[in-house]
Amino acid sequence: MIARTDDSRLASLKGRLVVSCQAYPGEPMRSPTIMAAVAQAVVEGGAQGIRAQGIEDLKAIRPLVDVCLIGLVKRGSDGVFITPTVADALDCVTAGADIVAVDGTRRDRPDGQPLAATIAAVHAADALVMADCGSLDDALYSISVGADCVGTTLAGYTGARPVSRGPDLELLAELVAHVSVPVIAEGRVRNPDDALACLNAGAYAVVVGTAITHPTRIARTFADQLAHGARRSDPEGSR
């Protein structure tokens, strides 16, 4: 299978920011309407792409933004849970995804189909595939079966590499040096300096999620810092 690396939808992301608009189950913002509003807001702020999960979220976001939409489905939290089946991938395309993000590892999938089957089905539906990888081996495997681009999304989460404090720049550089398709940096990009470091390491585009779209985590960072500072400055707190 041949990757479609010259596709205009993928080309629109080159050197640009992609924002992951996702909320965790049970959180106040876990609503397609809210995620669609977040997507609109970050596009107004300059995002050139949106990454979103869940069919209803994709359906809500698609009519409201005209940038590249990377779609996925999450099922569970162990093993292959990012767009784990061929049917899930096709549902993402039907919901409006330009690029479908899938697990790019060699692990068994719940429908028993190989990654190649998912990629072939997505290509037949005129969409592209982003393979979320945790190692160079994952990326090379995904590309061999037709992935159009690869991401560092799973770095530190498959057992192949330790979890890095920030973005896994070492893996990013390794992928850039050894693969023939665009490499998208994703995972633990916490500030603009991290994002720029990813571009400087050769990333085709950079995905930022929690640092932009997760107010609970952002607020906790501020609250914890203030609480820590207050304890240090309070003489009573040192006794």
Positions of the model-derived regions?
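Conserved N-terminal beta1-alpha1 strand-loop-helix module at the mouth
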Residues: 1-94, 129, 137-145, 227
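Short, surface-exposed connector motifs at secondary-structure boundaries
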Residues: 40-46, 100, 121-126, 177-181, ...
